[in-house]
Amino acid sequence: MLEYYKTSEKGMTRIGQPETGCWINAIAPTEEERDFLTKNIGVLQEFVKSSLDEEESSHVDYDDDFDQTLVIVDYPSMNKIDINNVEYFTCPLGVVIMHGYVVTISLYESWGINALKEGKAKGIDTRLKTRFLLTLLLFISQRFLMCLREIDRLSTQTESRLQQSLDNEGLLRLLALEKSLVYFSTSLKSDETTLQKIHRGKQIKLYEEDEDLWEDVVIEMN
């Protein structure tokens, strides 16, 4: 699926076709849509491939020849197995910053992307690519925090039940939650390293007015 958005006086607005200064959002793009991204928009093929690789870790990549930057970050997700069991995991999300566009590419929908589409970010402008990226990272870090609080709540609840009655189902649930914590801890450390590279690097121009937002993201990730 390919979607196109652009900010206007009314906020975040979906548009029918890509145009300069817009945000292109690709979720589980088909082969035809991938070709459109590479041939019509000009996104590097390896950037599209990396963004859709579930094993890809958080990092920053820059292509000097085409002046394109790829930022891969991990974002939290969950799968509700049944009423008592929830599985938490992380997925990669690619953000391509290039001439004329900012492009997000992922295999699955994410809370952060949906929040941007729904206009929940104040003062966002699709033409301001650095601010767009940092706002997305802020939403992702806030989602991590929400999930961590829920994991803590479920862990405490499960431990309390196990103290009263030891059972295999409860033990498996607790192990799954601990596994989720390990995933999240690893992903947050990787995202934090990527955030520091963004701040130190020259590939993404960090404007003075973006410094406060960058600091907000750092605080949330810590």
Listing of model-derived features with the role each one plays in the protein:
Residues 1-220:
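Peripheral, non-transmembrane regulatory/ligand-interaction domains of membrane transport proteins
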